[in-house]
Amino acid sequence: MMIQIDIPTQQLTLVDDNGHVVKQYAVSSAKNGVGERNGSFCTPRGRHIVRAKIGTGQPIGTVFVRRRPTGEIWDSALHEKFPGRDWILTRILWLSGREPGFNRLGQVDTMRRFIYIHGAHDLAEMGHPGSIGCIRMRNIDIVDLFDRVPCYTTVEILG
């Protein structure tokens, strides 16, 4: 399996080992566009892997802070209570760059930037950039993708 993320179309495509499309999902990448620098709040390009899978068995809407469940489940009332929170929900696929000097090591390290593919709240619009660097998905879609891919799956982000 391989994950391809096309930034211009805001689509994530899961591809099998024979190159056939298994499934496509609408996503939301960074509102600042693409870029690899730490602190840019951009989505990094290039070849990555899924370094860690976080959230197995958690309920849909589980809120994560620093990759740990908070015990909260997202709803609109919680959203109103914490309007500026960066909502990381349901499941996390933590990415690691595979290209030293481009998206790995130093000031361009995807993993040290905490770039994930993760679930988003119901108010987040898919198909348009809106994150602060991560790839957001609908909660039902991240559960589906999470269950289909193992750690070390290749992720290609095209921008």
Where are these regions (language model features)?
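Short, solvent-exposed loop/turn elements at domain surfaces
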Residues: 35-36, 58-61
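Soluble periplasmic/extracytoplasmic beta-strand elements of cell-envelope proteins
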Residues: 4, 13, 49, 92-94, ...
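A structural motif detector for short, solvent-exposed N-terminal "entry" segments of globular domains
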Residues: 1-33
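Extracytoplasmic
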Residues: 7-9, 22, 45, 88-90, ...
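N-terminal post-signal-peptidase region of extra-cytosolic proteins
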Residues: 1, 26-40, 72-79
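Short, surface-exposed secondary-structure junctions/capping segments
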Residues: 35-53
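Exported/periplasmic cell-wall-interacting domains
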Residues: 60-159
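Well-ordered beta-strand positions in beta-sheet-rich domains
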Residues: 24-26, 47, 114, 154
